[in-house]
């Protein structure tokens, strides 16, 4: 029997009570948590040849890097975009390694005033890689400061105020800006046009995720067979960060409740205990789909209305929940709003209304 939206047994207490879910508490959230940092550093590939998946991205980068190195120049500026957890930060590190260049990392929200960015740009070294994560959250004034720096390797600094103010131009060492975003549509056209290399990262295939899991298991010194890797790979939402997080939890289960080896049966039992189903859905995904089905007859329902019903931010729905549900075909995003597809009804063993029958 499928629980209804109001059934508190179906969700954690905070979700059932209508509180906003904390993405950091979701096992299948691609948003990084503090606990992930040291763990991810252990598993992070250092070179393009070690990076699994994203063949088009790797090919484009390999050609661009080899060409830049042969000319003795800094690599052209790179924009990496796509859902969280797919390897944008890892690729930025790899670019620096492949270019044998220094690496510096910052983020859009961290840079608050012009002085923050000016201090970084005036100290960049020749061919250095400067990585700005969440670049879509960069303030407009700081965006404008970047224009001349990335295009002409010059920085215009205003000294003084009022009528006596004057502009002083400083030369900046040729460097590579690598920017990452989950919301490419929020970037201004002038900033986006300054990236010579623009690459989209896609969700990973099950086969690639199995290879990633086997590599991670070897580094963690835990035995995993084909069935165990396949079981985790099908439930990690096409995202390596989630795959590695689930691997840690399944490893714990195997050591305490199993024989120390991760096989299919052990992985299934562990993931059932963690309430991650065969699609990689958790209670928050189910709540979103059930809300559309039960409260709005399958949709369409507007984003703001849906966000209010779920007590969630619109950004969280657009950036975190929807991409994977749309990718799997459980949700449609239409001009009139969000629509639950026939797959969502089948998942809950419900019959679509007549309007859904006609659509699918």
Curated annotation (Swiss-Prot):
Q: Which InterPro entries did the record assign?
A: AAA+_ATPase, AAA_lid_4, DNA_helicase_Holl-junc_RuvB, P-loop_NTPase, RuvB-like_N, RuvB_C, WH-like_DNA-bd_sf, WH_DNA-bd_sf
Extract the ranges annotated as region (Head domain (RuvB-H)).
278-360
* Binding-site residues for DNA, renumbered to this chain: 333, 338
Compartments it resides in: Cytoplasm
Instruction: List, alphabetically, the SUPFAM superfamilies matched.
Output: P-loop containing nucleoside triphosphate hydrolases, Winged helix' DNA-binding domain
Region: Large ATPase domain (RuvB-L); residue ranges are 12-204
Superkingdom assignment: Bacteria
State which Enzyme Commission number(s) the record gives: 3.6.4.-
* Protein role: The RuvA-RuvB-RuvC complex processes Holliday junction (HJ) DNA during genetic recombination and DNA repair, while the RuvA-RuvB complex plays an important role in the rescue of blocked DNA replication forks via replication fork reversal (RFR). RuvA specifically binds to HJ cruciform DNA, conferring on it an open structure. The RuvB hexamer acts as an ATP-dependent pump, pulling dsDNA into and through the RuvAB complex. RuvB forms 2 homohexamers on either side of HJ DNA bound by 1 or 2 RuvA tetramers; 4 subunits per hexamer contact DNA at a time.
The domain-related comment in the record is:
Has 3 domains, the large (RuvB-L) and small ATPase (RuvB-S) domains and the C-terminal head (RuvB-H) domain. The head domain binds DNA, while the ATPase domains jointly bind ATP, ADP or are empty depending on the state of the subunit in the translocation cycle. During a single DNA translocation step the structure of each domain remains the same, but their relative positions change.
What is the name listed in the Swiss-Prot or TrEMBL entry for this protein? Holliday junction branch migration complex subunit RuvB
State the organism of origin: Koribacter versatilis (strain Ellin345)
């Amino acid at each position: 029997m499928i629980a209804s939206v109001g059934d508190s047994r179906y969700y954690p207490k905070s979700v059932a009570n209508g509180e906003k879910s904390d993405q950091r508490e979701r096992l299948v959230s691609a948003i990084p948590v503090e606990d992930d940092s040291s763990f991810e550093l252990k598993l992070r590939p250092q070179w393009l040849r070690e990076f699994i998946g994203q063949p088009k991205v790797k090919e484009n980068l390999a050609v661009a890097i080899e060409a830049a190195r042969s000319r003795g120049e800094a690599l052209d500026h790179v924009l990496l975009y796509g859902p969280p957890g797919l390897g944008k930060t890892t690729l930025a590190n790899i670019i620096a390694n492949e270019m044998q260049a220094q690496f510096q990392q910052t983020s859009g929200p961290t840079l608050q005033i012009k002085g923050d960015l000016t201090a970084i740009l005036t100290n960049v070294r020749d061919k250095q890689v400067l990585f700005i994560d969440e670049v879509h959250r960069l303030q407009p004034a700081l965006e404008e400061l970047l224009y001349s720096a990335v295009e002409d390797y010059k920085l215009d600094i205003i000294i003084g105020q009022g009528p006596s103010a004057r502009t002083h131009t400083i030369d900046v060492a040729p460097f590579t800006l690598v920017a990452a975003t989950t919301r490419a549509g929020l970037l201004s056209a002038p900033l986006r046009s300054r990236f010579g290399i623009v690459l989209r990262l896609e969700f990973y295939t099950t086969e690639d995720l199995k290879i990633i899991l086997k590599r991670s298991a070897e580094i963690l010194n835990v035995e995993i067979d084909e069935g165990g890797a396949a079981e985790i790979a099908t439930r990690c939402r096409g995202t390596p960060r989630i795959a590695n997080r689930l691997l840690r939890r399944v490893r714990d289960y195997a050591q305490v409740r199993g024989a120390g080896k991760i096989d299919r049966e052990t992985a299934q039992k562990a993931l059932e205990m963690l309430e991650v189903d065969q699609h990689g859905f958790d209670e928050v995904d189910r709540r979103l789909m059930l809300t559309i089905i039960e409260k709005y007859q399958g949709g369409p329902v507007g984003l703001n209305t849906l966000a209010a019903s779920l007590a969630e931010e619109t950004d969280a729905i657009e950036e975190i929940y929807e991409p994977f549900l749309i990718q799997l075909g459980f949700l449609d995003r239409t001009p009139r709003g969000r629509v639950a597809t026939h797959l969502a009804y089948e998942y809950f063993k419900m019959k679509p209304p007549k309007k859904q029958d006609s659509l699918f």
